[in-house]
Amino acid sequence: MRVIVVNSGSSSIKYEVFALDDCSTLVDGLLERIGTRNARFKRRWLTDSGHWEEMEETRPIADHHEGFRFLLDAAVRYPTTRVAPGAFFGFGHRVVHGGEVFHEPVIVDDEVVRRIKDLIPLAPLHNPANVAAIEALRLIRPDVPNVAVFDTAFHQSMPPKAFLYALPHELYREHHVRRYGFHGTSHRYVAGEAARHLGLPEDYANLITLHLGNGASATAVQGGRSIDTSMGLTPLEGLIMGTRCGDLDPAVHFYISRKTGRSSEELEAMMNKESGLKGICGTNDMREIQRRSADGDARAQLAFEMFCYRIRKYIGSYSAALGRVDAIVFTGGIGENSAPVRRECCDGLRNLGVVLDHRRNEEDWSGLHEIQREDSPVKILVIPTDEEREIARQTIQTIRRAGVAGGARNQ
């Protein structure tokens, strides 16, 4: 039996097939340009000999429903007995926004679909595609349970002092204006991996997890629970990101509008798509920023310093919130691969018990590794995130608790 994890976008479907017994990856793939006559399908599968093979093809795919029919058919037709046709145990879906309704993964039924649709105003770019995937798979394979795993769920443990804004309370009561946080599946995954590596019970470990990619967020994890996180009502708040500005004086919006005549929609687009690293130096690619900075580009150096300075401030803030910090965890594309970013974020934090080993930080590693000096009271860990595997784990756990595993054989 196997689990299929789905991450559905407005014109794409990313998926991964996991073995039920050990959550190992058997197949992964991407279907993009849905709605066109030249949709591109890329897939990779594990052969009996333990090697990966891959292929790519182009074909017309009208919509998500047709896309999922094609993917499910392809999922049972790989030339390897490792993924020979068998029962689907379940489908796990990444859903971006669960609001205050969903604190944990849930088996999808009509009521769950309705509630996810009700939350579309909080995530208008993501929840519609997530719902489309759920509805398509429920229609195509009604015998297989679907599980919704929410990016926001991990942060629902934040206390009111952390998630409320200092605004008139009726805005929260009537319109749900509050901090929700995102990247929760990634933060949950690396927090669990860190606790296991440190030999600490998850309900004891105090961690600062840093998911650094084109989107970036920090989370304070106390005893396995998120008690604060940098993103807010939307992913725009918090750290400087590839194209998002992060924390900003709200009056900046009004000032720019008065000076330029830009509408609120134009300002929202600018702060989400044209700001952050891209706004400072013209690119959101940290690798290019580091190359240009090394060549003496002042704007690139400024972007690099601003990015890391904001992270350092959050490390200090969350150290105060946690009281005791067992480890700082770097993950995400930048967090896992940029030694200069990790160095700039950690250097000068000795007073917080953070002492980086520069040699270990620069070495090439694979998998989880420590980069602190031996005398550092706080561990510094680099942990590759695996949101799809975490969704698979949560899907399996949720289905087993509910006792509703799919049992029909694939045709």
From Swiss-Prot:
One GO biological process term: acetate metabolic process
Report the pathway entry.
Metabolic intermediate biosynthesis; acetyl-CoA biosynthesis; acetyl-CoA from acetate: step 1/2
Q: Which SUPFAM superfamilies match?
A: Actin-like ATPase domain
Annotated residues for binding of Mg(2+)? 7, 387
Q: What is its EC number?
A: 2.7.2.1
Q: Where is the active site?
A: 151 (proton donor/acceptor)
What's noted on cofactor binding?
A: Mg(2+). Can also accept Mn(2+).
Q: Which terms are listed as keywords in the entry?
A: ATP-binding, Cytoplasm, Kinase, Magnesium, Metal-binding, Nucleotide-binding, Transferase
Specify the enzyme's EC class, one word: transferase
The record's GO CC annotations read:
cytoplasm
Q: Which residues bind substrate?
A: 94
Which PROSITE patterns is this protein grouped with?
ACETATE_KINASE_1, ACETATE_KINASE_2
Q: Name one GO molecular function term.
A: magnesium ion binding
Could you say which residues bind ATP here?
Answer: 14, 211-215, 285-287, 333-337
The catalytic activity, as recorded, is: acetate + ATP = acetyl phosphate + ADP
The record's Pfam families line, in alphabetical order, gives: Acetate_kinase
Q: Which cofactor does it need?
A: Mg(2+); Mn(2+)
Site (Transition state stabilizer) at 183, 244
The record's annotation in NCBIfam families points to: ackA
By sequence similarity, the record places it as follows: Belongs to the acetokinase family.
Q: How does it assemble?
A: Homodimer.
- Describe the function of this protein: Catalyzes the formation of acetyl phosphate from acetate and ATP. Can also catalyze the reverse reaction.
Question: Any idea what this protein is called?
Answer: Acetate kinase
Native species of this protein? Syntrophobacter fumaroxidans (strain DSM 10017 / MPOB)
Which lineage?
Answer: Bacteria, Pseudomonadati, Thermodesulfobacteriota, Syntrophobacteria, Syntrophobacterales
